[in-house]
């Protein structure tokens, strides 16, 4: 076995991970080498990248253009039995148990796939705080998957690589599938499985890059809250005075777009922790949606798409130009890029102080919620546990139309502990920091159109500069929300959602429908006193 390294780091032994007769290990290659490897003329199928006119390489991920939560499993053993938020028939989630025996079979499959091959190994960190970060090792035979990992995790220095020991290993066997899936009692031949005792993730059958990123997020969501540290599906940025804001929201609600703000420095766009020192990024890159991307509306993200960025599932014309408006492969077109592709970032480490503004983003497909409302501490817990939004087309396999959904903590797919644990840790951090919370609807209203990005940016500006605190307010019934009646730079006719309907009764009937869904969803949290006490903070029907 030869080890080709673009670092001074010591050679690595992959036999301890179960790999045999590996031909060559390419460890932490440079971006130049990855570019050459992923565009090689002899590559075929999903391995082959094409160079676009912007300089970024574009790849296709096949039938999996989003995560496949139905194929996610976790080994149930002494490590996980007590703390893991296991799925139940009454409250289903994505944490489905498998036995050690099934794991052993799947591990054999993946190690067979990667053994005897030339493999890429990327060693990196998940978490900008050295005290709580996970040292991650990803092993793959596909160059662009190594590129994705290099973009998305925190890149170690040569000194750190020399003594690097992984806390968690990801083995990506995208080319292999499990033919014994029925016998194993699994959902399909594809799999994304975790073993917290072995501290390993195995991937088979899916080429989608996000499985590696979100897999490690799920692990941070397990380890950190047990130490009293908030682990959050949010973006974060910092103002010139050092004030920190965090934005919660599911895919497509505007986390990346709204936190990438020329007036503020970006801490990160998707995954963060909040400890005694403040808010810190888990990642070393961004993973932005590119559907309908334009230079005018989102200049920072557009300008980040250059050499070393990696596009997924976009339509590339023969001349190398990109049709960002084409969602024929998927609405979930993406780009990953190292965070330094955004000019205005917090340096040298992606972390800030304690947050003083917490923003919940919802894309309301019903057209009921106000564009912005200020939340009481009880409403904060209620809406955090509810995690309402509309699932937008194509962000998960099998979802094609906007449908309303409730996702606990704005990230139920990535939670590995009970949702109330995250709410408890977040609200404790907010109370200690004196942070205010706001619910922002980036979705639709009675006009049938999506609220414009310009109006939403105006709302965010008013929250961040404090002018929303000076604005006169009115009460919106059913949801019992306080909304401003005017904000600088925001169309005043949209602030009360009832005003966007020709007939206000139409809003009322939709609001009652949505309120009932909130109430039905929240019932699962009312099996204890804390949950029961929050019911009054949610929508009320007479």
From Swiss-Prot:
Entry binding sites for ATP: 214, 233, 249-257, 298, 334, 450-451, 456
Entry's cofactor comment: Binds 1 Mn(2+) ion per subunit.
Enzyme class: lyase
Pathway: Carbohydrate biosynthesis; gluconeogenesis
Keyword Protein biosynthesis: no
Residues involved in Mn(2+) binding: 214, 233, 270
Alphabetic keyword roster: ATP-binding, Cytoplasm, Decarboxylase, Gluconeogenesis, Lyase, Manganese, Metal-binding, Nucleotide-binding
GO cellular component terms listed in the entry, alphabetical order: cytosol
Gene3D superfamilies per UniProt: 3.90.228.20, Phosphoenolpyruvate Carboxykinase, domain 1, Phosphoenolpyruvate Carboxykinase, domain 2
One Pfam family here: PEPCK_ATP
Positions of substrate binding: 67, 208, 214, 334
Chief place of localization: cytoplasm
Gene Ontology biological process: gluconeogenesis
EC annotation from Swiss-Prot or TrEMBL: 4.1.1.49
Subcellular location, record wording: Cytoplasm
Catalytic activity: oxaloacetate + ATP = phosphoenolpyruvate + ADP + CO2
Cofactor dependency: Mn(2+)
UniProt key word ATP-binding: yes
Record GO terms (molecular function): ATP binding; metal ion binding; phosphoenolpyruvate carboxykinase (ATP) activity
Complex and partners: Monomer.
UniProt similarity note: Belongs to the phosphoenolpyruvate carboxykinase (ATP) family.
Function description: Involved in the gluconeogenesis. Catalyzes the conversion of oxaloacetate (OAA) to phosphoenolpyruvate (PEP) through direct phosphoryl transfer between the nucleoside triphosphate and OAA.
Protein name: Phosphoenolpyruvate carboxykinase (ATP)
